[in-house]
């Protein structure tokens, strides 16, 4: 990660939306980090799109107005959700994977990349997961490993400058882990209590 954060600085999060994105993949971290910010944890959260600002149609038909194009140079954390992985011709992650210009820009991003579910496959296509511990949705694990990642069977995998989450609902655990990692376990527990949610699975951390 190419930045040094003072404790007084807000953690600037951008969540990338695109046509075909899985609703749960991005809603969970937006909810968790937005709540953390309101509780004084120092997170700011922004929805962004790789194209011009406008309406994104999600996997299950939800339409979201995204007011911002992505500006990764202004982010400390870039969250890439998944969606549409099983349909290689429709909207979803495969359109991002096919966009070589986007992948080149993504590969050069200095913000901490965070992949949720099959959004990890977008990071993989950009070469970010190659040779590194990572996880993804169960249906994509074999391909992730074939593309050079070191597959870890954990809910959240934190390799310091790369974080990945496995499964559609893993965005909850990933986001709560981000709160814990950046502002402490006590603050993460406060958010968890307000959400009335109990984290599941394990967090694997590189030594």
Question: Where are each of the predicted segments found?
Answer:
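Short hydrophobic/aromatic-enriched beta-strand-loop microsegments
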Residues: 130-138, 151-154
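Extended, subdomain-level signal for the structured scaffold at the beginning of enzyme domains
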Residues: 1-113, 121-125, 141-145, 150-153, ...
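Structural detector of well-ordered beta-strand residues that form the stable sheet scaffold
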Residues: 113-114, 135, 152, 163
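Conserved beta-strand segments that form the floor/walls of ligand-binding pockets within enzyme
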Residues: 79, 135, 157
